[in-house]
């Protein structure tokens, strides 16, 4: 017979980790289920060395450091953590029965903090791309590229941020198919004032190498036949990620474009199931780590009140505990 938990959190990224910690402050019995092999979500797996800019009070905080601090914070409590375990169904009985790829769990409430779901990078679609060993989609140790010629493809926050990071240690070129970047204004200004070589509006058109090591990248100006060739040692593709919410559509929750619709309590269309972070939707929702961290206490406190209506939604402040 499965143990009965007060709160089961689906997702072990930053928002899920903080929700678990806060649930312990309310003395809830809580567990975490995550489909990934490690805690931390995208910041830990995809951006361990990228600076996280939207966590207040922590300048120069990397994805790995954020993850480690949240895990350290949670380690003060006994929290069962189930990794490599995918949630298949959530069935409302007397309690909630969660069926996963490895078994089943019973819980009084559920907080879904699964971010954008399963994710994989959008690939560079050029002939022969699969064979090149120096084409990368994420950075695990930036220092190994010191002094190398680096070219980055993309125009969003990740591409701009990585260009600024690489500029400190390597000759860096950024290629984007549009004149304007889809990144924070402050970052774009820093890019324009940096030593990064900016190629816009250009798109990659041909890979030049021996099939294993890429030596040059041909780029073509958009709506033109003009071409240029870039010498490089490493090519980083930052075209964003394809995400999949998997079985979410089968859980009987109201959705808005694959996001869970929630009310002001962070509660879904099913009473007792809450959603926080990038997986939830409400009018005016902003997808930031900081936003999700703020949503976590709202979901936890309302889950506590759902379990026991005599428990106040507004708890004591942590400074008075």
From Swiss-Prot:
Cofactor names: FAD
EC numbers, comma separated: 1.18.1.2
Residues bound to FAD: 34, 42, 47, 87, 119, 278, 319
Annotated catalysed reactions: 2 reduced [2Fe-2S]-[ferredoxin] + NADP(+) + H(+) = 2 oxidized [2Fe-2S]-[ferredoxin] + NADPH
GO MF entries: ferredoxin-NADP+ reductase activity; flavin adenine dinucleotide binding; NADP binding
Similarity annotation: Belongs to the ferredoxin--NADP reductase type 2 family.
Entry keyword annotation includes ATP-binding: no
Keyword list, A-Z: FAD, Flavoprotein, NADP, Oxidoreductase
Quaternary structure annotation from Swiss-Prot or TrEMBL: Homodimer.
Matching InterPro entries: FAD/NAD-bd_sf, FAD/NAD-binding_dom, Fd--NADP_Rdtase_type_2, Ferredoxin-NADP_redctase_2
Cofactor binding, note field: Binds 1 FAD per subunit.
Top EC category: oxidoreductase
Name listed for the protein in its UniProt record: Ferredoxin--NADP reductase
One Pfam family cited in the UniProt record for this chain: Pyr_redox_2
Region forming the signal peptide: none
């Amino acid at each position: 017979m499965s143990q009965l938990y007060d709160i089961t959190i689906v997702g072990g990224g930053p928002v899920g980790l903080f929700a678990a910690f806060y649930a312990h402050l309310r003395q809830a019995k809580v567990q975490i289920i995550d489909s990934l092999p490690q805690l931390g979500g995208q910041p830990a797996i995809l951006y361990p060395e990228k600076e996280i800019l939207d966590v207040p009070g922590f300048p120069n905080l990397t994805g790995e450091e954020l993850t480690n601090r949240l895990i350290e914070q949670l380690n003060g409590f006994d929290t069962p953590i189930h990794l490599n375990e995918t949630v298949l169904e959530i069935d409302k009985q007397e309690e909630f029965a969660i069926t996963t790829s490895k078994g089943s769990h019973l819980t009084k409430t559920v907080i879904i903090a699964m971010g954008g779901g399963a994710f994989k990078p959008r690939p560079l679609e050029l002939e022969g791309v699969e064979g090149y060993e120096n084409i990368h989609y994420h950075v695990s140790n930036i220092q190994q590229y010191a002094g190398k010629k680096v070219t980055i493809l993309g125009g969003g926050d990740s591409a701009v941020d990585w260009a600024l990071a690489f500029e400190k240690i390597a000759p860096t070129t950024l290629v984007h198919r549009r004149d304007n970047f889809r990144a924070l204004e402050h970052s774009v200004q820093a890019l324009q004032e940096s030593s990064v070589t900016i190629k816009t509006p250009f798109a990659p058109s041909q890979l030049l190498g021996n099939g294993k090591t890429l030596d040059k990248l041909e780029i073509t100006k958009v709506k033109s036949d003009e071409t240029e060739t870039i010498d490089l040692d490493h090519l980083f593709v930052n075209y964003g990620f394809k995400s999949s919410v998997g079985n979410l559509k089968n859980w009987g929750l109201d959705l808005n474009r694959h996001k869970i619709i929630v009310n002001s309590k962070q509660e879904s269309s099913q009473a007792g199931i809450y959603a926080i972070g990038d997986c939830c939707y409400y009018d005016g929702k902003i997808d930031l780590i900081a936003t999700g961290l703020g949503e976590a206490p709202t979901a936890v406190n309302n889950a506590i009140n759902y379990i026991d209506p005599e428990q106040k939604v507004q708890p004591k402040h942590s400074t008075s505990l």
